[in-house]
Amino acid sequence: MSQYAVVTDLNRCTGCLACTVACKAANGVPVGNFWIRSMRVGPVTKEEGGQFPDVNMYFLPMQCQHCATPECVTVCPTGASIKTENGTVQIDKEQCIGCGACLSACPYGVRYINEDSNVAEKCTLCSQLVEQGELPACVAQCGARARFFGDLDEGIDSFEGPWRPEAAGTYEEQQAVRVKIRDAVQPFEDDDLHQLPDTGNAPSNYYILRHHYGDRRDREWRS
């Protein structure tokens, strides 16, 4: 069994919302609802003050974490929420009755009930694209090249992002070019890798936030 996930470099993310727009376009997400949203964290005020580049602020893309032990799957009374072989958490809309139990169980608030169809919806990690060998839309269209997709069972170093801007060829050819995460971002260490708070669900997505980035040696992870 695999565990597909997304790694986001928060030192690169600019909060441009390209991931949100790409997700909506690829998945037909209704107006007013989001499968991924970008949250601004900070700026954090210091008693002693501070000046650039010690600004202590970052953007945090939030989506389904495709947890290893998802509580939303456990509480679903009809078995509509399922953990798949590739590690993603999906919703069988034919089985969903819109009871909202999974919404209450999710610690990250990334599910909602579609008012038109009365079924729960959330990020699918673009399963329709991944099955064709493509990257999730939020990864492929990230303007800052801050997002990477892969299988945690193969290690984070195996995660890949979209083509480099200098890649030649047609759009389709460019989309076929991938770059490994460590070849695309500033160096990071194990203690620069963070996850959202674990309430027993074991989230799968990772976020890079460097404590040693430039002169910002006292940067802290805040959620």
What are these regions (language model features)?
Residues 1-223:
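Non-ligating segments of multi-cofactor redox enzymes
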